[in-house]
Amino acid sequence: MARYRGPRLRITRRLGDLPGLTRKAAKRSYPPGQHGQARRKRSEYAIRLEEKQKLRFNYGVSERQLVRYVKKARAQEGSTGTNLLKLLENRLDNVCFRLGFGPTVPGARQLVNHGHVTVNGRVTDIASYQCKPGDVVAIRERKCSKQLAEGNLEFPGLANVPTHLELDKAKLSAKVTGRCEREWVALEINELLVVEYYSRKV
C-alpha cells in the first residue's frame, strides 16, 4: 500500500488524534461517510487493524515498511511492541518532527528529502535513516534551510522534546542520546494489538 496523500482529517475522524499526521483537530468525532454515525460492534480483527493503521498513518510508513519494522522488532531483545515504537520514533523524519524542525512528520520528511538536514555533518536525504545514540542531527548551514526550521520551531507540533534528544535551538542541532522511552511516544496506541495483527501474517 502506497503512502497516503489524501485528506488528513478524514483519517483522524476515523482513527482519532494522530499528532504526526496533522495538527488540526477533526470537528466531528464520528467516522466519515454515509454510515459514519451508525454504531456497530467491531470484531477483534477490526480493532487490531485500526491500531495498525494508526501506526502507519502517524509515522507515514507504507505497509511494506511497517512489516519490515515488525520483523526487526521481533529480532531484538525485549518487548516486540515497544521495540517497534522505538524503531519508528528513531526514524530521521520523526526525529526532526519531535525536535520541532517540521510541523508534522510529512513536513519533516519534506525537509529531509529536500536536503535541509545533516547527520554528523553530512547531508542526509533518507527519511527512514535510523538515528543512533551519538548521532548529531542538524539543519544545514544555508539561509533557506535555517529559515524553514526556525519558522517551524516557533510553533512546534508537540510541546516537549523527548529526553533522548538534546536540542540546541541556537545551533538548530540536536544530539541523539539513546532510543525513545515508551512514555515519550505521543501517539495513543496499543502496540500489542499491532503485534497481534501481524502475528499470523509475518
Curated annotation (Swiss-Prot):
The keyword Ribosomal protein applies. Keywords: Ribonucleoprotein, Ribosomal protein, RNA-binding, rRNA-binding. GO terms for molecular function: rRNA binding; structural constituent of ribosome. Residues 15-42 are annotated as: Disordered. GO terms for cellular component: small ribosomal subunit. InterPro entries: Ribosomal_uS4, Ribosomal_uS4_bac-type, Ribosomal_uS4_CS, Ribosomal_uS4_N, S4_RNA-bd, S4_RNA-bd_sf. GO terms for biological process: ribosomal small subunit biogenesis; translation. Residues 90-152 form the S4 RNA-binding domain. Signal peptide: none annotated. CDD domains: S4. It holds the Pfam family Ribosomal_S4. SMART domains: Ribosomal_S4, S4. It comes from the Bacteria. Belongs to the universal ribosomal protein uS4 family. Part of the 30S ribosomal subunit. Contacts protein S5. The interaction surface between S4 and S5 is involved in control of translational fidelity. One of the primary rRNA binding proteins, it binds directly to 16S rRNA where it nucleates assembly of the body of the 30S subunit. This is Small ribosomal subunit protein uS4. It comes from Parasynechococcus marenigrum (strain WH8102).
